[in-house]
Design a protein with these regions (language model features):
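Eukaryote-biased, non-catalytic alpha-solenoid scaffold regions
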Residues: 1-406
Length: 406
């Protein structure tokens, strides 16, 4: 079916009907990704048509997903990623003011009708959607009256208003910073207060911005977001060392320890890998071993082994590291295998079986044989087994007949 606005036959349109998806999230996630890909492909040749398609998708996505199970957060994350990509498409389109205002009206209505809500993020990105300061200022004027009531410290007046975030984002894009700070002066909710922090920083009052952000910490505050905003303020001031020391770890926390290390190392290219690792390890007391993969990936093999020995480390991760380094770093392979056996002997690891014992032992033994230290290696394995009652019962049983000196 063709879009009524542009005549383009969007494939996603038929798929994103009201209540189109059942409770399973994966089919919906796949369709969301396909729709974004379809729109971005068109954007290469016709950015106006693509932007109109992006608006159409954002109008239809929430009603289509009404029955999808969102408890895991997967579908919400997929939609948020789609919103970020499509906002960029809309913002980049060389549209005239009338066309852009029409898009904004459509998105505003979609956001107002968003019951789940799936497209709530649009409010945060309203400044980007406005593109120009003039359009943003008109939206700020339109929304600021109700927003003042919604943000009132008087509980009799205060309430939720779907246009609040659009108002704050519009004020910021319009560079009406002082007005934004004044509006949010009594505000406690961080999701709103962060705009005052951004405004103060934009006004050059960066020390004041940092103080406001730090004073906003609390049980209902997103600590990672506070750290990211503070880090951004310091980096924009050229205070790299202070940003690194105070905020790098919390601001760049990712889904895995390895991903976190890579994010920090990428953002701070002047910092040596050893320094990045030290800062991150210090930020997670008691979790030293979980940084093993990050240290290994950075080529800090001695540090990786030291971390793995300090606190429990996944034996399978250690065994894979031993396997992968037999030829190029046999000393490391030996140590990784031995540490894996040690943690298994102590009872660590999820549903460990005899296969996991062999996975740790075999590459380490091969590496030792390559170096001519097989006798010493077997002695160290026997020492591990003898140190723990459970280890003697399990690891020793699995490796029975393998540890003679002959």
């Amino acid at each position: 079916m063709a879009s009524k606005k542009t005549g383009h036959p969007w494939a996603f349109r038929a798929r994103f009907r009201a209540n189109a998806f059942g409770w399973k999230s994966q089919p919906a996630i796949t369709r969301v990704r396909e729709a974004v890909a379809e729109i971005k492909k068109v954007a290469k040749s016709d950015p106006i048509v693509a932007a109109d398609g992006a608006v159409l998708f954002l109008e239809r996505v929430s009603p289509a997903l009404a029955h999808v199970d969102s408890s895991s957060g997967a579908i919400g994350s997929a939609v948020n990623r789609a919103i970020e990509e499509l906002v960029a498409v809309i913002a980049a389109a060389p549209a005239d003011v009338k066309t852009r205002e029409a898009w904004l009206e459509r998105l505003y209505e979609a956001r107002a009708a968003d019951e789940i809500p799936y497209i709530e993020l649009l409010g945060d990105l309203w400044g980007e959607l406005c593109v120009t300061k003039e359009i943003a200022s008109r939206w700020a004027d339109r929304e600021i009256g109700i927003t003042r009531h919604a943000l009132s410290p008087d509980p009799q007046m205060r309430g939720h208003y779907h246009g609040t975030m659009a108002c704050l984002a519009s004020l910021y894009r319009a560079e009406r910073y002082a007005e934004l700070v004044e509006l949010l002066e009594p505000e406690k909710f961080w999701h709103y207060k962060r705009w005052a922090v951004k405004a103060l920083a934009a006004m050059g009052k960066k020390a004041e911005a940092l103080r406001l952000a730090e004073s906003s910490r609390g049980p209902w505050t997103h600590e990672g977001d506070v750290a990211r905003l503070c880090e951004e303020v310091l980096l924009s001031s050229g205070l790299v060392d202070e940003a690194f020391t105070r905020y790098a770890a919390d601001a760049n926390r990712a889904g895995t320890y390895l991903a976190t290390f890579r994010a920090v190392a990428k953002k701070y290219p002047t910092k040596a890998p050893e320094e990045v690792l030290e800062r991150l390890v210090a930020s997670t007391p008691g979790d030293d071993g979980k940084w093993f993969a990050a240290a290994k990936d950075a080529g800090l093999l001695d540090a990786a082994i030291a971390l793995a020995k300090k606190t429990p480390t996944d034996p399978r991760t250690l065994a894979r590291a031993a396997r992968d380094h037999v030829a190029k770093e046999p000393d490391f392979a030996i140590e990784a295998g031995l540490v894996a056996l040690d943690w298994i002997a102590q009872g660590y690891g999820y549903e460990i079986t005899s296969a996991d014992v062999w996975a740790a032992y075999a590459p380490a033994k091969e590496a030792a044989d390559r170096l001519g230290t097989g006798v010493e290696f077997r002695a160290r394995v026997r020492s591990i087994i003898a140190s723990y009652t459970r280890g003697e019962a399990f690891v020793g049983h699995v490796l029975r007949g393998q540890l003679g000196d002959a």
